[in-house]
Every structure is written in structure tokens, then in C-alpha cells.
Amino acid sequence: MNAPDKFASLLALTREPFPASTKSYLAGSQPGLRVPVRDIQLTNGEVVSVYDTSGPYTDPAVQIDVRKGLASVRGEWIAARGDTEGYEGRVRKALDDGQKAEDGDRLAQLRAEAAALQRQPLRARSGANVTQMHYAKKGIVTPEMEYVALRENGRREWMQQYMQDTAREQRLAGNPLGASIPKIITPEFVRDEVARGRAIIPANINHPEVEPMAIGRNFKVKINANIGNSAVTSSIEEEVEKLVWAIRWGADNVMDLSTGKNIHTTRDWIVRNSPVPIGTVPIYQALEKVGGIAEDLTWEIFRDTLIEQAEQGVDYFTIHAGVRLAYIQLTAARRTGIVSRGGSIMAKWCMAHHKESFLYTHFEDICDIMKAYDVSFSLGDGLRPGCASDANDEAQFAELHTLGELTQIAWKHDVQTMIEGPGHVPMHMIQANMTEQLKTCHEAPFYTLGPLTIDIAPGYDHIASAIGAAMIGWMGTAMLCYVTPKEHLGLPDRDDVKQGIIAYKIAAHAADVAKGHPGARARDDALSQARFDFRWQDQFNLGLDPDTAKEYHDETLPKDSAKVAHFCSMCGPKFCSMKITQEVREFAQQGLQSKAEEFNRTGGELYVPIHRAD
């Protein structure tokens, strides 16, 4: 792999701070609790602070060596609680990386390159429970909860100038559609939401590098990006670079969906270098361990895989425990059958053995593993619809009902839980999904893949799905799983990753504005004001993608002088509506001034006497 050279070149661009941006930190109540924000310096002297997911990669003051991983954020907090213990951990096997021989040259090379990324695993002490939900139910406000509160609030002082018009704010007030969003997020509010199961803070005790974040209906809508190799393409260094690229553009969480070789080592590199929570679908690696033959899967192999990944620091597992034997026949009349990889694997296993899935029958055993490491459940929708004509059918909602039952079992163990959702759903059927999920799953956070609203957009599915994502985000979904232009077509590269993330940042932000999340619209107002003032650089820099905005502008007006011009190439200097509006305002102001002078000349009386000739 020659990791040092390849990573150095791949990460060079990704470490560049955004234009006119600097990293700053909000201080918490205890030493070491520092929450990052990105400050955008405007040409008029204003500073706009925005939520930041890029971790230390965009902080020039931080030295990063990806061969060793990121510095710990939470290590001292975890140790201070006194309820964990270090231990030797399971023995790493060649099969973990898809290798058959323990003494192979390739395996030795992989392990040597990842040697500095190894950590002694932690687990809960005997009889202890180390989940954020457990602490929350006991009334404990953890540093992670305070971190989340500071992060959700951000630095709000700059917003006030855009929120002073009371009439405007009332006119534009959002509709939360049943959500309960306070004006200020307090640590106690975070604790209460986690205790109720309405929010999760995915943060494995073996992932101390993670910057805590919350997924819940009453917080900002989050987005997830998927990366991972396949049996056909990609490499470890490419996947790590995709991770850093994804969080640069705004991915709140990242899932490693690797299905090819070197799965274990790829995950070492990803987790140790990730400041955001990492999720996986453990059944993928378990399937690799049995040569891709679903029928050969066993509970013992799956259990070993869960512990393996929990020790590495994975923050949440997608587990398709809701795929029950009786539900499989409900998919027979579908146009596209079972489209979830995990769902199809478990369906095949159930049919081959003609009994319930071991994920379902051993669910409480899985809970015991989850709570020992604080791994969150992402209960998978293995029977989600794969096309619009299969949406909201009996199979989909039967599984959802089971996921609601499993959620209550997980909560009995104080295991944090979110619910995965579709998929492909026409616009007029989206609300029914949200309503059913809130009722059936007891307000556990909903995490949806889109949904795609139409099926005729190959190459543009990121747009077709962002429409549904914006809608369901407004209705109450807590996290949106991005879709890239390559959906249904192939493994996304870094450009596809960026396009998918930007589409979903748009959807999530639109949902926050519609819900009336405090201050959500202020950045829009700042950009609108920059646009009206013809502050082109500020327009670029306030956008979600400054690079593309500047590139499009400069295709026709590349000179520096165009950055202060009061027009663009769309309308030119004579037909710019904003320039004309400014001129109209100037004329109106001049007219008012003229009338004021006339008023003063006539004596300053409101009513001027009329002198009539006798």
C-alpha cells in the first residue's frame, strides 16, 4: 500500500481550510471540553459561525498522522467514570481480513502498516452498563451530553441582526409538526431526550476520537454518508480519503459498508481516523467469513463479529433483526422483492433453515454485547421497498412493527436505538411512513435512505431522493442517509460522495428551516444580504460548496474586477434586478429627501393654509 506516500498526497487537498474560514472552539464547563465551529469571515467585517463536522483535518494547528490515528477527545471522560476495564480482547484472525492463511505475506504487510492504529479494547466492568442512555436514565449529565448541547447551539451572537424584525420572524416561523424544539439546547434537555429514547449519542467507549453528536427529532437533522470497498474495486487508502472528504462536506456520520477483502484492517484505518461516529452492517463481514454462503452463517460467527467490531470502536450496528420468517412470503408479489443486502441475506438463511433468524432469537444476547461497549442499534429495514410501487406494503409495515417491539427490548437494556426506514416512497405516501414510525417505534429516532420519490432518475437519484429526504426530515426523521449519483449503478468515487452529501445537506437544512429550528435561517439571510450587496466572495463562502459556486461564476466572469461588479453573466449590467432595485431605492430615498426639504421650506406645517383671492 505504501501508505505514507499515498495518504500524504490524497489528503493534501482535504486538509485545506474552507475559503475565508477558521476553526474556533466553544469552551465547556470542564477542561478539555472544546466544541469546534467554523467561522466564516465576511468582507464587511461580519463573522458567521456554522456547525462543523470536519474534525481536526481543517485545523492547521493540529498535526495529523493517519498511520497513528487522531488524538483522543473522550478518553479522560470515559476513564473518570470508573466503570470500564481494559482487557486483552479477541485474537485477531486472518479470516477477519478475508485471508485464508495466517502466515501470508499480504496479511503480514497489512498488520505492519496498521500496527500503530491498534488500541487495547475497553468493555464495561462486570455488572456495569456504560451506555449514554443508562447514564441519562440515572439522571447523569455526561460530558458527551454537554458537548452535544454546545454543538447544537453553536455561536449564535452573529444571528441576532438577522432576527430582529419581529413581524418577519412571525411570518417565517417554521412548523415543527409535533417536534418539541427549545430555543436553547441545554445539557439537561439532551439528557432527557436520550433517557426517553428520542435521541441517541452514538459513541462507543473504544472510539474516544469521536466528537459527540446527537441524532434525534428535536435536534438538527443529520446526514450519513456511506463508504467502503467492494469485491470489485477500491482500496484502504481510497476509503480513508473518502471518509475525510465526506466529513469535510458535512457528513455527520459515516457507515463503512465494506464487502471486499481486508475488511478488518480497512475498519482500523477508518475508525482511528474518524472524528464522526462510524456505523457498519456486521452481517457483511460475517458473510465473508463463511465464503459468501448465507446458509452457513451461525449465531456464533455473528457474535464473534459483533465483538470484533465493538472492540475496534464501531459506534452503531445495522442489524436486520426484524426480518422474520413469516414476513418473507409477504414480499412475493413485490415488483422488486427484497432489495436490502442484509435483509436478503437473512431471508435466505431463514428459508434455508426454515426457522426464525438468529438475529431475532438472540436479540437480548446482542443487547448484552451492545451495552458492554455502548454500541447503538440501527435496526435495519431489511424489507424496505425497492421501488415506488412496493412502498407502504404489508411486508414493510410488518417489519416496522417488529422493530418497535425490539426497540422496547433494547431500551430495557438501556441500549441506544434508532430505526432505519425506506427507501422508495412517492411524495404523497411519505407522511404515512413518518406517522407509522412514530407510533410503532415509540418516537425512537428515524433514519431513512432518502426516500427516493421516483424511479426514473438513474444518474440523478441523489436529486430524486433529496426531495423525499427534505420532506421526511421536516416531518420528523432525525438522520438522512445520503444517496449519490451512482445509486443503483456502481460504487461511488469521491466526486459522487461530495455530490450526494451536498444534495443531502440541502435537504437537511431545508427541513431545519421548515421545522423552525432556532437560527436555522440566519445563514440564508446572511447569504441573501451578500447577494443583494454584490459581495460575490461572501456569496461563495457562505454557500454549502464555495468551490463550485466560484467555479460557475468564473466560467464567464473570471477577472477579479468581476468580484465587485454589480451584475453577473445571467443578466448583465443593464438587466440585473437587484441593481435596478437598489437604484429604485436610491431614487425613492432622494425623492423623500426632496419632499422633506420642501416640507421644511413651507414652514414645517403638516397642513399649509390655502390663500384664496377675495
From Swiss-Prot:
Its cofactor is [4Fe-4S] cluster. Binds 1 [4Fe-4S] cluster per subunit. The cluster is coordinated with 3 cysteines and an exchangeable S-adenosyl-L-methionine. Homodimer. GO terms for biological process: thiamine biosynthetic process; thiamine diphosphate biosynthetic process. Belongs to the ThiC family. Keywords: 4Fe-4S, Iron, Iron-sulfur, Lyase, Metal-binding, S-adenosyl-L-methionine, Thiamine biosynthesis, Zinc. GO terms for cellular component: cytosol. [4Fe-4S] cluster binds at C568, C571, C576. Catalyzes the synthesis of the hydroxymethylpyrimidine phosphate (HMP-P) moiety of thiamine from aminoimidazole ribotide (AIR) in a radical S-adenosyl-L-methionine (SAM)-dependent reaction. It is an enzyme of class 4 (lyase). GO terms for molecular function: 4 iron, 4 sulfur cluster binding; carbon-carbon lyase activity; zinc ion binding. Pathway: Cofactor biosynthesis; thiamine diphosphate biosynthesis. Substrate binds at N226, M255, Y284, H320, S340, R341, G342, D381, G382, L383, R384, E420, Y447. Zn(2+) binds at H424, H488. This is Phosphomethylpyrimidine synthase. Its EC number is 4.1.99.17. It catalyses: 5-amino-1-(5-phospho-beta-D-ribosyl)imidazole + S-adenosyl-L-methionine = 4-amino-2-methyl-5-(phosphooxymethyl)pyrimidine + CO + 5'-deoxyadenosine + formate + L-methionine + 3 H(+).
